[in-house]
Amino acid sequence: MRLCLKCNTATLILQISTGPETRQISGPATSTQIRNFTLCQHLQGIHTHISSMVADLPSIATDVLSPYLAAIYDAACEPVTPLFKAMRDKLESCILQIHDQNFGADDADMDNNASSYMEELQRSILHFRKEFLSRLLPSAANANTAGTESICTRLTRQMASRVLIFYIRHASLVRPLSEWGKLRMAKDMAELELAVGQNLFPVEQLGAPYRALRAFRPLVFLETSQMGSSPLINDLPPSIVLHHLYTRGPDELESPMQKNRLSPKQYSLWLDNQREDQIWKGIKATLDDYAVKIRSRGDKEFSPVYPLMLQIGSSLTQENL
């Protein structure tokens, strides 16, 4: 069986295409992509079938076969993972356009349409669903074969979670944010939830990312004095709340992104690789700079966001003691 697994895996891997065409997401699925989809499904079918057989074997046999099963699973992921990465990059690119919008206007006419960047994101998700996910995701009847989540279902779930968190991250960085801007942002969040839920993955099943989206929407409408005691902040990463508070502070209270002259994309890449307590260190440095500016002028009054941000950040410090 072990030799057979090796031969079958090697033969199928050689058939996988890896060129640029496999990552295209702008047009219909190409014949090369469709062939890769078939290979993914075939390899996953082999993995599922053999896994069910191995479950009944002695543990010594399981130990021997496990590395080869892992190799089959990795091979099954290879034909589709670049496609999902390309789509994730596309959706992130759409979301980054939030920083090109004017959310600080006070007298803009409110309409029922989503922002232009959100409309582009919706179109992209709908196209991906129609041209790719319709071929990749299992039917409802086979959605959980042997209780195992399919590779493409897992990749779709991960992408949906990433889109929600990435959106909240960048929405929290928007500055300035007027009352009209809050309404526009809330509308965009509703459209995002609908697009992801209908075309990618049921948002209610995404757990923490979904709870964070649902918490951030009403959070932006709270008075600053209400935020410290609001249960909404329990469903949000502290960095999201802290970044949002910058928009409520004076211009001289610069965010780490502003202080370090980073683009939203650069700062986001940095955030991807940091823990919450590490992000707090960067935020604390800007609060210290702000305090120095205030004291150097002889002022004694700080913006209300200053003690609130220190309060939220101190909880991160205590958690890591």
How should each PLM-predicted stretch be described?
Residues 1-321:
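Extended alpha-helical "rod" scaffolds
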